[in-house]
Each structure stands twice: as structure tokens, then as C-alpha cells.
A protein has these predicted regions:
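Short amphipathic alpha-helical coupling segments at ligand-binding clamshell hinges
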Residues: 130-144, 202
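Extracytoplasmic small-molecule ligand-binding "clamshell" domains
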Residues: 45-57, 62-88, 93, 177-243, ...
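Surface-exposed aromatic
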Residues: 119-124, 189-193
């Protein structure tokens, strides 16, 4: 009989992993501390020739610069990543709106605007073509706000503030009536940002005032750019608010409101007048303070952890039950059941998990009213069941046919034979590989942010969008994922060990 108990070599697995984890943490902190010192001079468009320029992926700057052969273009998803590229020497400058960073944020991260172009881009909210009445209402509201002076007052309060974080949102009575679902994928002061659990910024205040004007109730959710676009087109969102530039190409896909602001393109470089790099200990303290303590940002982590655990546990339970059903179908004597199960398994194996998740949320289950969390549980359960069902089938088939015949000879019914003879042996055989699949399921939940679920990974994105710290939030969730995956593995190891002892 194979002994599945832990060997001494396996027992030291965690001991070996901890130094690696600490090394990863120290490396990230040192990377955050390091700073490139060579000044980059950009006083005009001509000065960018031959330089490495970072741009936000899919932005108007990406589109404009992608055809140039006289520069090296690097694409990044977040502002934090572009700042890190600047400090690590991977980019000489990055392009973004001139309002992308407040003066206080630029001072804190040691960057400055080297050159601001005269070219301006109008910003507007995007809606579907069937929402022309909402667009008309907003345009009317905006025109009245400009005429009354309210618009200018809002712009002065947010855009002239040295630190947008200190600007207070107006105390407006909550709007009621038809719900206006807003998708945002832009988290930068002073336009749109989270302070604790409160949405703030120029865009948000305009939307709140418009909601009261039009007797609508706001529901704001954060998506990435691709997710926000899909949410708008499928009806998961009614309005897309992300400081979107109004372009002729985008007008073919969405209906824009009148412009509510205009920004200029700017080149950001390291500020040679910035303070010197901090020491390791000071950087650690600042990282904890800025990413966890300020504005109670640790709550993003705890909320994301709760969401991750809910999805993981529910998917594990539902997926295991579904796997048992599919395994029964695969081992059925009815050919049509076997074929149906085989097609299902091949289908789930052939579709990337992220693609399946987005198809289920934005297409298949879009009109059901199910929450994003429920859709995620269903999607993960479907994929988990496809893989685990084959593990179950292989484990059952590993039990000799003679044992089943012996059970029947002893007077057991087929069900009793399976329950008391085959199942215990199959369970002992399948648990080690089941453990690996369960841990993979837990780690794969990190993609649920694509459907606007604030899990652990999305929590780190929210923190990074506020602090522009590229490393610290990621290291925090890396440690959490590692510890939880290790704990899950230990629980399943305990189950295997207990099963072996019970049989002895």
C-alpha cells in the first residue's frame, strides 16, 4: 500500500520557500528605492527622437506614437508601472495627460512635466447609441452649469488644488429614481479616485450633480479598460466615465456627451531636484504607511480577501459536485451520456479561463441578473469540474475489477460496493492530484477583476492607482496568496494523511 504521508523532504518545503519569499520582498523594496539619476531633457517634440517613451496601453498616445520609427515605444497598463519604468531606466519619459498627476504626487514620486504640448483633447462620457435621451439630458445640464458659473467653480476647486485629496465632495442629497450604472477605468486625482469607500473627483462630482438633475441613482463600479468597454456594450453599464478622449474613431462605437474638460498631452521625466533615494528601512515604513495606513487602504485588502475566499470555496464545492456528475456520465453504459461528458470536457479544456469568464459574464449570463461573483463561481466550477472529473475517473479505474466482483460476492449491492470498497481507495489515490488542482483554482481567481469583482488582485490595483507604487501592493498580495495556498495544501495533506491512518 502506498504511503501518502509527508516525507521529511516534503516537510521542509515551506522552510525552503520562506527565504525565497523574503528575497522577493527585499528585491522589490530595493527596486522601489533605486532611482535613475541621469537627467533627461525634453523641451520639444524634437527632443524625444532616439529616446524610449512609455505610453498607456491602448491610449491615444499609443495610437499616435506607434507609427514612429525614430523612438522606442514601451506600453504599460498603469501609471505606477510607467513611473517604475522611469526610475529603473527602462524608459526615458512617459506620456500622459497633463492632469494625470497632481503636484503633490509628482513631488512624492520625484517626477515632473518636462514638456506640455499645445495639442488639446476633449473629454466626454461615453454611452450606447440607444441612450441618446440621456446624452441630451447631460448636455442640457452641462450647458446650464456653465451658464450659471457652477461648472467653473467645480473646475477651479478640483484643478487648482495643490493636493486634490484635501478637496471635499459637496454634501448632496442622494439621488433617487432610475439607476444609472457607471463604469470607470480611470483612477487618478483630480478626475476620479477612491478615498476609502468614497468616490471623489471632478468627473464624479459632475455625475453626482447630473444624477440629481435627471432624478437618477448612481451606481459606480471599477473595471479595466477592456472590461469597461464590454460592460457598456452589453448593458452592464449605462455610462463610461474614464476621462475618455473624443475621437472620430471612437464615435463609430459609442455616443459621446459634449466635452466636459480638455487636457493636453505631456511628457513626464524624473525630477533631478527630487530628494535622494531613501534607505531600505525608511522605504519599508513609507510603503506600509502609504499603501495600508493612509485612508484605511488595508480595507481594500480585507475586502478583496473576503471576495477571493468566497469565490474559491464556493467554486471548489460546486466544482467537486459537478465533477462527480461528469465522472458518472463518462463511466455510464449509455453512449450518449459518455459522448456528452467527453464533449464538455474537451470544450472546457480548449477555452482559456479568462475568455470563458468574460463570455459568461458579458454574453451568456448577461441578461440573467446574476451578480458578478455568482458568474465567477459558475465559470470556475465548470472548468474545475472538467479537469477533476477525469482525475476521479482515473482513480476509480485504478481500483481492480476483482475488488468490485468480490464485493458483490460478499452480498454487497453495487452501490454499497462502490461506497465501502471502491470509493475509499479511489479517494486516497485522487486526493494528492486534487490538491494541486484546488490550489490552481484558488490562484486562478486573480483574474476575476476583469468582470468588476474587487478580489485581492484588484485590491492591489486600486491601491496602486492611488499611490503609484508599482511594487509594494503586489508584494503584499503575493505573500497573502502564498500563505493561503500553503494553508489550503496543508488542509488537503491532512485529509490525505487522515485517510491513510483510518485505513491502517
Amino acid at each position: 500500500m502506498t504511503d501518502f504521508t509527508k516525507t521529511p523532504r516534503q516537510g521542509h518545503h515551506t522552510t525552503r520557500c520562506l527565504p525565497l519569499l523574503l528575497t522577493l520582498l527585499m528585491t522589490a523594496v530595493l527596486a522601489a528605492c533605486s532611482s535613475r539619476t541621469e537627467p533627461v531633457v525634453i523641451n520639444s517634440e524634437a527632443d524625444v527622437v532616439g529616446k524610449t517613451i512609455a505610453v498607456p496601453t491602448g491610449s491615444i498616445y499609443d495610437i499616435d506614437m506607434s507609427g514612429r520609427q525614430d523612438i522606442k515605444l514601451e506600453r504599460y497598463t498603469t501609471m505606477a508601472d510607467m513611473i517604475a519604468a522611469l526610475k529603473n531606466g527602462k524608459a526615458d519619459a512617459f506620456m500622459n495627460d497633463d492632469i494625470a498627476m497632481s503636484a503633490s504626487d509628482m513631488r512624492r514620486h520625484g517626477v515632473k512635466i518636462a514638456f506640455r504640448s499645445d495639442r488639446a483633447f476633449d473629454m466626454g462620457y461615453a454611452l450606447r447609441f440607444d441612450e441618446a435621451d440621456v446624452v441630451e439630458q447631460f448636455n442640457k445640464f452641462l450647458a446650464e452649469a456653465k451658464e450659471s458659473g457652477l461648472y467653473d467653480e467645480i473646475c477651479r476647486r478640483w484643478m487648482d488644488a495643490k493636493d486634490p485629496n484635501t478637496v471635499q465632495m459637496p454634501q448632496l442629497e442622494p439621488a433617487s429614481g432610475t439607476e444609472l450604472k457607471v463604469a470607470t477605468s480611470f483612477l487618478m486625482a483630480p478626475m476620479c479616485f477612491l478615498e476609502g469607500d468614497e468616490w471623489k473627483g471632478l468627473e464624479i462630482e459632475l455625475l453626482q450633480r447630473f444624477a440629481r438633475y435627471a432624478h437618477m441613482k448612481l451606481d459606480i463600479k471599477y473595471y479595466d479598460m477592456a472590461g469597461a468597454s464590454a460592460a457598456l456594450q452589453t448593458g452592464k453599464a449605462d455610462l463610461w466615465s474614464s476621462s475618455l478622449f473624443i475621437t472620430e474613431e471612437r464615435k463609430k462605437s459609442v455616443l459621446f456627451t459634449d466635452p466636459y474638460y480638455a487636457s493636453h498631452e505631456a511628457y513626464y521625466v524624473l525630477d533631478e531636484q527630487a530628494t535622494a533615494s531613501k534607505g531600505l528601512w525608511q522605504s519599508l515604513k513609507d510603503g506600509v504607511h502609504n499603501n495600508l495606513i493612509v485612508e484605511d487602504r488595508w480595507k481594500f485588502i480585507t475586502d478583496g480577501l473576503r471576495e477571493t475566499l468566497i469565490i474559491s470555496i464556493c467554486s471548489l464545492l460546486l466544482g467537486t459536485l459537478l465533477a462527480a456528475l461528469i465522472c458518472w456520465m463518462r463511466m455510464s453504459r449509455r453512449r450518449w451520456l459518455q459522448s456528452l461528458a467527453a464533449v464538455y470536457i474537451d470544450l472546457m479544456r480548449g477555452i482559456p479561463l479568462l475568455v470563458l469568464l468574460m463570455i459568461m459574464f458579458y454574453v451568456v449570463l448577461a441578461q440573467t441578473g446574476l451578480s458578478a461573483t455568482t458568474v465567477a463561481v459558475v465559470s470556475f466550477s465548470m472548468v474545475f469540474a472538467a479537469y477533476v472529473s477525469e482525475m476521479f475517473r482515473t482513480a476509480i479505474m485504478s481500483v481492480g475489477q476483482g475488488q468490485q466482483e468480490a464485493g458483490v460476492a460478499l452480498g454487497f449491492t453495487p452501490l454499497q460496493t462502490f461506497r465501502y470498497i471502491i470509493l475509499p481507495q479511489a479517494a486516497r489515490a485522487v486526493l494528492p492530484v486534487y490538491k494541486g488542482e484546488a490550489v490552481s483554482l484558488f490562484k486562478n481567481t486573480s483574474i476575476v477583476g476583469y468582470i468588476a469583482i474587487q478580489d485581492l488582485t484588484k485590491a492591489s490595483d486600486l491601491i496602486r492607482s492611488r499611490t503609484f507604487d508599482a511594487f509594494f501592493p503586489l508584494i503584499i498580495i503575493t505573500i497573502i496568496y502564498f500563505l493561503l495556498a500553503w494553508l489550503l495544501g496543508k488542509v488537503l495533506d491532512w485529509a490525505v494523511k487522515g485517510k491513510v491512518k483510518s485505513e491502517k
